[in-house]
Amino acid sequence: TSSSGFFFTLMAIGMAVSRLFSGKLVDKGMITQVIQAGLYLVCFCFFGLSACGWLADWNLQATSIAFFTIALLLGIGFGTMFPAYNTLFVNLAPNNQRGTATSTYLTSWDVGIGIGMVIGGYIAEISTFKIAYLSGAILTVISLFYFYGKVSPHFHRFRLR
């Protein structure tokens, strides 16, 4: 439908906008902070998408505004995280393994997105999209804790650049 096309257009705009500032922050060495900000934003957006299901019962116009605002913010969140994660992987690899690090990251990202879509689709099929997005939000919260507890300390301890 036209609304899904508009959703993904806004998401693409958000991704483009995020590149204007996130790259500069990563260049200043704020890699983990940029990733954390992106994770927070994506988590907020998944909770927001879940809430849109309940908001639709109350006010359809407010739901549309929230839905499209979330699209823009989701694009900013993913656009912020994606290149920062790549930089994190590359900065952990020796110079002769940088290509392998990028390839590993991109493969992991694709597999994660694919698995997430299959599981999210299954959850939505047996329950509702509200529950599927709520599940995504909960998994993002778990990933935030994992990033704080394991990934960030490991990166700061073993980074090569």
Walk through the language-model features, giving the residues of each:
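Intracellular juxtamembrane helix-capping segments at the cytosolic ends
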Residues: 80-93
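Hydrophobic core of transmembrane alpha-helices in multi-pass small-molecule transporters
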Residues: 62-80
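Residue-level signature of mid-helix packing/kink "hotspots" within the transmembrane helices
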Residues: 12-20, 113-114
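Structural signature of the two symmetry-related core transmembrane helices
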Residues: 33-49, 137
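Transmembrane alpha-helical segments of major facilitator superfamily
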Residues: 6-15, 109
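A membrane-interface helix-boundary motif in multi-pass transporters
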Residues: 122-140
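Loop-to-transmembrane helix entry/capping segments in MFS-fold secondary transporters
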Residues: 1-2, 95-105
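Helix-to-loop junctions at the C-terminal end of transmembrane segments
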Residues: 18-31, 124
